[in-house]
Amino acid sequence: MDNLITRHQRILVVFPHPDDESFTAAGLLAMAIEGGSHVTYACLTLGEMGRNMGFPPFANRVNLPTIRKKELEESAEAIGIQDLRMLGFHDKMIEFENPDLLDKVIGNLLEELRPTLIFTFYPGYSVHPDHDATGAAVIRAVEKLPADERPLVYCSAFSSGHEQAIGKADIIIDASSFLPQKMASIQAHRTQFQAAELVGNQELNSKEIKRRFGTESFWTYRFE
């Protein structure tokens, strides 16, 4: 882990929705930032088509984009992210976007930021079509770079049976020391985090929180 912090001072995170950063990489990002890394988070959409409106509901279809934008800003602040970019794509439409446009947008970020490490979703193994399409766009953009100029790409994967296809994660991080930042990031997404498929509305004790959220796992993408 020390090697990650010292080697990767410019990190780019590319996810499609607010809260993807929270559950996937908030602890590791907080750790890297504390170690001196500069993190740019490019969030493709505002998750405006999400079905969760809070528990009990306090948002609606009209104001959800504004609320989720604010939640995203609060989440990034909780992690310590220095540079938050909202790219303005439409939620649940990433798979239908012009691939050339996605590649150009991400390629421009690569050219501007020169990251040495990128976090995204593993295309084909991250359940949601927006996740898969986002990860695929990142891989295409990085693949266009000369091999010796490509940043490392750490991917999150969690589809059913993914380990049979891509093996076990090769990057496993104990982020338990950064659970306060991670949980603050999760809880910033007030419209979302109590959904049954996420945290749920039950109270979690410290042992349960550490078990569920204290470890973050990634797959290094292997370019051919």
Residue ranges and their predicted role:
Residues 1-12, 83, 92, 96-224:
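Metal-dependent de-N-acetylase/amidase catalytic core
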Residues 1-113, 144-147:
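Active-site rim/loop-helix segments in enzyme catalytic domains that contact anionic ligands
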